From Swiss-Prot:
Belongs to the EGF domain peptide family. The keyword Signal applies. InterPro entries: EGF-like_dom. Expressed by the venom gland. It is found in: Secreted. GO terms for cellular component: extracellular region. The lineage of its organism: Eukaryota, Metazoa, Ecdysozoa, Arthropoda, Hexapoda. This is OMEGA-ectatommitoxin(02)-Rm1d. Ant peptide with probable defensive activity which acts as a potent agonist of the mammalian epidermal growth factor receptor (EGFR). Mimics, both structurally and functionally, vertebrate epidermal growth factor (EGF) peptide hormones. In vivo, intraplantar injection in mice causes long-lasting (several days) hypersensitivity of the injected paw to both mechanical and thermal stimuli. Its long-lasting effect is unusual for venom toxins whose effects are usually immediate. Residues 1-30 form the signal peptide. The keyword Transport does not apply. It comes from Rhytidoponera metallica.
Length: 103
């Protein structure tokens, strides 16, 4: 009984460590993963993503077929990052702190 309890605790700690270590640190820039490539310059020049960064996803089921996506800037959502996410409480908190500091 004691051994199974210890095994459960160890498993829980390992999962917690993995989850916490995979979370980005504030201000940290993540590298593109193995299935993401930079977008062609033409798409970046045409502002494919309104408020974000364009990435070319490599589809494993259809290699060679281009699929582009956006990694949105903070507080923006949508297919091309064109919508301000007003449901994010951080948007209002960030706005209040900048307003208060300018007074």
């Amino acid at each position: 009984m004691k051994d199974s309890y210890i095994s459960i605790v160890i498993a829980y700690l390992m999962v917690t460590f993995i989850l916490v270590s995979s979370m980005p640190i504030e201000g940290e820039k993540r590298e593109l993963g193995p299935h993401r490539l930079p977008c062609p310059p033409k798409l970046n020049d045409e502002n494919y993503c309104f408020n974000g960064k364009c990435v070319h996803l490599v589809a494993q089921d259809e290699p060679g077929k281009p699929y582009y996506s956006c990694i949105c800037d903070e507080f923006y959502i949508g297919e091309r990052c064109g919508t301000l996410d007003l449901t994010n409480p951080g948007y209002f908190l960030k706005g209040q702190s900048s307003t208060q500091s300018s007074i």
